[in-house]
Amino acid sequence: MFTGSIVALVTPMDDKGNVCRASLKKLIDYHVASGTSAIVSVGTTGESATLSHDEHGDVVLLTLELADGRIPIIAGTGANATAEGVCLTKRFENSGVVGCLTVTPYYNRPTQEGLYQHFKTIAENTELPQMLYNVPSRTGTDLLPETVGRLAKIKNIIGIKEAIGNLSRVSQIQQLVNDDFVLVSGDDATSLDFMQLGGHGVISVTANIAAREMVELCALARQGNFAQARLLNQRLMHLHQKLFVEPNPIPVKWAAKRLGLIATDTLRLPMTPLTDAGCSVVEQALKDAALL
């Protein structure tokens, strides 16, 4: 459940900015039918930063309800205050989630010791499996391999989503952890190379709109069929890249609406709709990927 193509799911909203139950159900059904390994609910792509604390929990619980056991759900539980991270994680204890994805604290930029103590404290306050999430471009803090190695010794810290974009991190981390520690990419554009170096999959933005393709890509990579995987990835590369023509999740929400997967591309301020220029770029990327 922590390997293969895991979707970083968008949080669909109606025209008024309220969570849209019907669109969320449609998305979940799409991923069940496509064979997606698991859903991350309310991560970065799910607009965790603009949902209230209560809404955050409510969306995860609604996702669990609508999934109804058909696909594993991983809860996004990142916070830049350790106590809040503990509180959010505890809300999902015994809820049915299979684990939590916990981003490094953002904005306050803790030291490596602070990062270690943050994740250690959260892990010690739950039985839920914890997956670390390193994305320095958003948080301003880099979780270094040595710190990951220390954290990997904690029994319920089971892996990391590594989105630094530096492929050397795969081997650096592998040298410091046991073989059962899960390494997944957080960058669609480099995810195939990440898997070829020994990674186990990807937590994917692209999978929101190309679920079957990302499932196939990961399956080919896990089988060692990198020649076929590269052919597929070449078709998707423009899409991987152009889904970030404006800040995530602006482009992918527009694309999901364009493909009829969600009813609107509504976002919460300060996120604003995709510009006309961005729409043209993403439209072409969808065509290049043979999705239109």
UniProtKB/Swiss-Prot annotation:
Keywords, alphabetical: Amino-acid biosynthesis, Cytoplasm, Diaminopimelate biosynthesis, Lyase, Lysine biosynthesis, Schiff base
Pfam families (UniProt xref): DHDPS
Subcellular location: Cytoplasm
Domain of life: Bacteria
SUPFAM superfamilies to which the protein is assigned, alphabetical: Aldolase
Pathway annotation from the record: Amino-acid biosynthesis; L-lysine biosynthesis via DAP pathway; (S)-tetrahydrodipicolinate from L-aspartate: step 3/4
GO biological process, one term: diaminopimelate biosynthetic process
UniProt-annotated binding residues for pyruvate: 45, 203
EC number: 4.3.3.7
InterPro entries reported for this sequence: Aldolase_TIM, DapA, DapA-like, Schiff_base-form_aldolases_AS, Schiff_base-form_aldolases_CS
Enzyme class: lyase
Catalytic activity: L-aspartate 4-semialdehyde + pyruvate = (2S,4S)-4-hydroxy-2,3,4,5-tetrahydrodipicolinate + H2O + H(+)
Function in brief: Catalyzes the condensation of (S)-aspartate-beta-semialdehyde [(S)-ASA] and pyruvate to 4-hydroxy-tetrahydrodipicolinate (HTPA).
Quaternary structure and interacting proteins, as annotated: Homotetramer; dimer of dimers.
Name of the protein in its database record: 4-hydroxy-tetrahydrodipicolinate synthase
Organism: Erwinia tasmaniensis (strain DSM 17950 / CFBP 7177 / CIP 109463 / NCPPB 4357 / Et1/99)
